[in-house]
Structure formats: structure tokens, C-alpha cells
Amino acid sequence: MKSRLFIISQYLLPHHLLSRLAGCIAECRVRWFKNAFTAWFAKRYQVNMSEALVEDLSAYEHFNAFFTRALKPGARPLDETPGAILCPADGAVSQLGPIEHGRIFQAKGHGFSAQELLGGDPAMAAPFMGGEFATIYLSPKDYHRVHMPLAGTLREMVYVPGRLFSVNQTTAENVPELFARNERVVCLFDTERGPMAVVLVGAMIVASIETVWAGLVTPPKRELKTFRYDEASRTPIHLEKGAELGRFKLGSTAIVLFGPEQVKWAESLGAGSAVRMGQQLAAPAQA
């Protein structure tokens, strides 16, 4: 009954208004408030501050600075296995596996269209048909910067407007097409394993999504917008494996897509597996 009421509330709540209000609170610089709120959050979610570059909670100018905190050098060593594809973020594997008939598995009885996830462009989605996906959920206690699974050159970024349903196991099991309905930022790279998409999916009270090349991407105007980076007039944007790609201000999900016969997921990983940025997520499927 409780989960049913929760799902009903997800359709009724003003997602974007609540998220913008959360963003205002998270950017509040009133010292007593931001210190008290940050301390409460760190205790409530058992955030490990010993690995943070700045351990003193009161040193952060606002809650968002704490939430997107940098880590100490070496806190997330990169797997050195030749050809390793790295996990882009701390969190847990929500699902991973093949993209079958253009669909990505969400939870029992639910899936969503890879084409819709990527913004609806058939040409962008075509290289991923029959490929592989991995969905990584970032919990409140996690490190909230997203990094490159492989070295790549940015080809395209797409902002896709949408709802802001909460992202958790309950919504994954009850909200159809969840990740293809929420607001998201699609980043398309050319890599040694062919095209790679990294999709940063928003959620309720996710105040904004940033990338290292564009800065703040959300919240923009409520329309789909495509940014091309492969034009001759632009300086190429190349990011090395393990380099920061972007960050969430208040959390959610990163989805990585590869084309067919390019990667093989680590056998130790499955739905629910805890992961850390920099560990091996997959290996090349072929030499």
C-alpha cells in the first residue's frame, strides 16, 4: 500500500518546482544553515569524509559544494588491466546487459527504448542497436562526479527535457520507461571501442547536471537541444580514460552504452553490485 501511494505521488507532485526549490536550498550560503544541513546529511547517509580532499564540512561554501566534493589523489585508483573499460561512477549496478530489439532492461516487466533514451534520433541510436548497456545508480552517500570509462573525443551532446521521477527500485519497478522519461543529458563519444554514449539522468530534487566542457546544462529551457562538437570550426574535446566528465548536484543515474560486439561486462557484476569509479566495468569483447 505504501509503495502504491508513493508511485501515485510521483505522478502528482510538481517535479521541476520541487527540484528548483531543492536547488535553492543546496546553494544557500547562510553559514549556520548550510553547516547544520551538511552535517545532518553527512551523518544521516554515513558519508566517508576521510577520502574527501576537504574533510572539514564547514569549509564548503554551500551544500552543493560538499555534495560534488573532490576526492584525495589516489582515492579512486584506475584499473590498469590492458583495455579495461572503467566504471564511470560510485554507486550500484541497477542493470546491465544486451540492448535487445532496441530496448534496454529496466526491471522485471519494464524496459525502455534506447532511441528514446538518446533523445529520439534514429541515426544516433543506430550504432547501439544490438549493443550493450550498464545502468549505475548513485546513492546520496556516493561521490557524485562521473568519469570517462574510456578515452574519447566528444562528438555530440543532447539535452533531453522530461519529468523528474524519483529514481530507486520502487520507481524502476513501477514507472514505465522511467529513464527515457526523466530529464537527461546525452554525451556521445568516439572511442577505441567505437561510439560510446554516457547518459546522465536526472531525478526528483536533482537540481542540475553539469559537464566539464559546457558547465551547467540543466535546468535550461524546456526543449530538446543538440550541441555538435565534431564541426571543423570547433577545437576537438578529448577526455582521457578516468577523466571527469560531469557531475550531479543532488544525485541520480549514469547509463553507458556501447555498440554490438565491443565490450564484455565483468563476470563479477550483476544487478545490485556495489561499484566504485575506476574499477573494471568491462573488457573488450574482441582484440
UniProtKB/Swiss-Prot annotation:
Q: Name one GO biological process term.
A: phosphatidylethanolamine biosynthetic process
Q: What is its EC number?
A: 4.1.1.65
> Pathway, according to UniProt?
Phospholipid metabolism; phosphatidylethanolamine biosynthesis; phosphatidylethanolamine from CDP-diacylglycerol: step 2/2
What's the short name of a Pfam family annotated to this entry? PS_Dcarbxylase
* Annotated signal peptide: none
Q: Name one GO cellular component term.
A: plasma membrane
Specify the protein's topology with respect to the membrane. Peripheral membrane protein
- List the catalysed reactions: a 1,2-diacyl-sn-glycero-3-phospho-L-serine + H(+) = a 1,2-diacyl-sn-glycero-3-phosphoethanolamine + CO2
- Give the positions of the site Cleavage (non-hydrolytic): 251-252
Keywords, in A-Z order:
Cell membrane, Decarboxylase, Lipid biosynthesis, Lipid metabolism, Lyase, Membrane, Phospholipid biosynthesis, Phospholipid metabolism, Pyruvate, Zymogen
Enzyme active site: 90, 147, 252
As cofactor, the record names:
pyruvate
GO terms, molecular function: phosphatidylserine decarboxylase activity
Provide the protein's localization: Cell membrane
Top-level taxonomic group? Bacteria
Chief subcellular site? membrane
What residues bear Pyruvic acid (Ser) in this entry? 252
* Processing after translation: Is synthesized initially as an inactive proenzyme. Formation of the active enzyme involves a self-maturation process in which the active site pyruvoyl group is generated from an internal serine residue via an autocatalytic post-translational modification. Two non-identical subunits are generated from the proenzyme in this reaction, and the pyruvate is formed at the N-terminus of the alpha chain, which is derived from the carboxyl end of the proenzyme.
Kindly state what the record says about how the cofactor is bound. Binds 1 pyruvoyl group covalently per subunit.
The record's comment on protein family reads: Belongs to the phosphatidylserine decarboxylase family. PSD-B subfamily. Prokaryotic type I sub-subfamily.
- NCBIfam families assigned to the protein according to its UniProt record, in alphabetical order: PS_decarb (TIGR00163)
Q: What does this protein do?
A: Catalyzes the formation of phosphatidylethanolamine (PtdEtn) from phosphatidylserine (PtdSer).
Subunit structure, as described in the record: Heterodimer of a large membrane-associated beta subunit and a small pyruvoyl-containing alpha subunit.
Q: By what name is this protein known?
A: Phosphatidylserine decarboxylase proenzyme
What species is this protein from? Pseudomonas putida (strain ATCC 47054 / DSM 6125 / CFBP 8728 / NCIMB 11950 / KT2440)
Organism classification:
Bacteria, Pseudomonadati, Pseudomonadota, Gammaproteobacteria, Pseudomonadales
Gene this protein is translated from: psd
